[in-house]
């Protein structure tokens, strides 16, 4: 999982693109360069000469600070270069700096995570489509996908999903034809198929698997959790022999989703924060699969506590304080001896 490359795009507002670029340049100790163009872009180089960018996105609803009126300059999208796992900490620090500088998000903002698709093939891509489809309902609930943003991150296309699993493509060309439902649209940047939670248009046009289902946040821990989740899902698709697209049904969503996260490899202290963020919006009992078992355990613990309390009370009743021992008892005790 940790060997996969990735990139991230985080939409925000509250500050201008120029301000955001200066903040990032300040973090790296370099200079921001205005590029302009269609996306009114700024470029910032790091110590490895990688390019981090700030660009405009028309879907962002601009908001400004207290004393200024919002305009299109407040549409800010942060775009990372190709990153490795250790870069997550750098991304977190940049996010903290932007937030401290006045950046904020609203319900028009989203986060897109791209995972390198070069290690995938037609089989593993079918796996990842099915893995996502099976857990889609739980993912949308735990991530609280904003209803207003759902047109930009639609659930799996049932036509594509059914065809993918009935015909089982043997090569990437067949998969591409199924994705576009005919003629390829890989050269169309804004092809309509891109607006899905799992976007394979990005595979054919950019060489990345794009996850689009995250509401934007400037909480560094949440951003880290989203990246780790995407890397874990991609890794599971790579190592799993096959995957079913049958939707997961559960009467205890929190337990079911936690079990899945552990199966993905998000286990141990390293991923404790990720599990916390990814489970906090789900209902259920994290420790017991069956809610009835949880209730039964509560009753057992309550009965045990009651029994212990009663035993403690009985012990106290049978204990005679030292100052209440009679004189005869004291004499008897002092006369007792052992001869050798």
Give, region by region, the residue ranges found by the protein language model.
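C-terminal accessory/tail domains of diverse enzymes
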Residues: 1-104, 118-340
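Short, conserved phosphate-binding/catalytic loop or strand-edge motifs used
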Residues: 107-111, 115
């Amino acid at each position: 999982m940790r060997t996969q490359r990735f990139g991230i795009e985080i939409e925000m507002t509250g500050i201008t693109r120029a301000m955001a670029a200066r903040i990032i340049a300040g973090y790296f100790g370099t200079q921001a360069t205005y590029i302009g163009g269609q996306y009114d872009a700024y470029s910032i180089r790091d110590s490895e000469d990688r390019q981090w960018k700030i660009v405009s996105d028309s879907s962002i609803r601009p908001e400004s600070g207290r004393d200024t009126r919002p305009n299109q300059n407040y549409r800010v999208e942060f775009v990372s270069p190709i990153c490795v796992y250790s870069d997550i900490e750098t991304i977190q620090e940049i996010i903290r700096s932007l937030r401290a500088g006045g950046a904020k998000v609203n319900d028009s903002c989203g986060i897109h995570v791209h995972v390198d698709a070069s290690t995938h093939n037609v089989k593993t891509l079918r796996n990842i489509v099915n893995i996502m489809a099976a857990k889609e309902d739980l993912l949308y609930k735990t991530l609280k996908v904003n209803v207003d943003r759902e047109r930009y991150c639609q659930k799996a296309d049932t036509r594509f999903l059914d065809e993918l699993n009935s015909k089982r493509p043997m090569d990437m060309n067949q998969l591409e034809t199924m994705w576009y439902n005919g003629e390829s649209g890989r050269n169309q940047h804004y092809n309509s198929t891109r607006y899905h939670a799992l976007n394979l248009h990005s595979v054919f046009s950019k060489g990345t698997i794009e996850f689009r289902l995250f509401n934007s946040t400037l909480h560094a821990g949440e951003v880290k959790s989203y990246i780790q989740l995407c890397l874990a899902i991609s890794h599971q698709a790579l190592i799993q022999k096959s995957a079913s697209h049958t939707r997961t049904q559960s009467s205890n969503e929190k337990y079911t989703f936690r079990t899945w996260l552990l199966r993905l490899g998000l286990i141990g202290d390293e991923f404790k924060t990720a599990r916390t963020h990814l489970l906090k919006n789900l209902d259920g009992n994290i420790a017991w699969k069956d809610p009835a078992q949880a209730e039964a355990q509560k009753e057992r613990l309550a009965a045990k506590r009651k029994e212990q309390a009663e035993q403690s009370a009985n012990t106290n009743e049978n204990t005679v304080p030292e100052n209440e021992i009679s004189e005869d008892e004291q004499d008897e005790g002092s006369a007792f001896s052992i001869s050798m």
